[in-house]
Amino acid sequence: MNRTVSIVIPTFNRARLLPRAIDSALAQTVPVEVVVCDHGSTDDTPQVARSYGERIRYLRRDQDRGPIVCWRDGVEQASGELIHFNYDDDWIEPQFVARTAPLLRDDVGFVYTRARIHEPGSEATRVMLRHPPGTRPMAQIVQFLLRDKLTVSPGCALFRRRDVLKNLLPEVPGARGVYGKNSGVGEDLLLFLLAALDYPRYAHVPEALSHFLAHPTSITTQAGSSGNMGVLADAYAVAKQYYLQQPGSMAPAQGLAGWWAKTRWKLASRT
């Protein structure tokens, strides 16, 4: 079954990086729709996007209302049944859609690939998400997501459009601080965890088909350089707490029970 795929590229003031993201989407070995959603860029982003003409759909909004609103706007305007988020500072291999889309069967909630991290000014890279390959029980990835301090990025994943519209929340309920307030931190994790409530399996492609650039303006890099990684982890902990409050959620495995009790106490002490 051939299903249409929309690659949504949310962007804000990254005219210099944007062409690589767009070019990688257009270079897919199967037909895709490319939607570039720009909320309030004040640099040359509009000129860069419009230079692609009818090869992409360019959505321009004058007001910046934050990443999540931009993500959702792009998905709402997309026509594909399947959605991939290709963030403006990242890029994907030409085979990304061809390798992931066939695995998104009826019982599979999402598909993700390994990702290669690139450091600016360095040829050295590292590969993350070296997980077991193939289609596997959803409980395996849920336990990883509950245990790990960070998460799997939507930038290396493929979802159903209907699931993104259902699970991409405006903000993580109960989140506090700079992260979790329409920043994409926590909301990205819930795309996976909330999808896990509706499907018994997920799929992983053991190839680094996604590329992430670690640069000074990325949220993770900014948090690390400013000593705010703890705040970042707290935002993800709030997302996990929200997931565990949902009917049908999978409780942490025995080895995680103590960790989760400490995490809940830590979050409660900050309210």
For the regions a protein language model found, what residue spans apply to each?
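A conserved acidic beta->alpha catalytic loop
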Residues: 24, 38-47, 63, 87
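N-proximal low-complexity "stem/linker" segments adjacent to membrane-targeting elements
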Residues: 1-24
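Glycine-rich, basic loop-to-helix element that forms the pyrophosphate-binding segment
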Residues: 61-78
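Short, acidic, metal-binding catalytic loop of nucleotide-sugar glycosyltransferases
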Residues: 23-32
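Acidic helix N-cap motif at the loop->helix transition within catalytic regions
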Residues: 16-19, 43-51, 91, 95
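Conserved nucleotide-sugar donor-binding catalytic segment
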Residues: 134-225
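Conserved donor NDP-sugar-binding/catalytic core segment of glycosyltransferases
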Residues: 95-127
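Short aromatic/hydrophobic "clamp" motif used to bind/position activated sugar donors
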Residues: 83
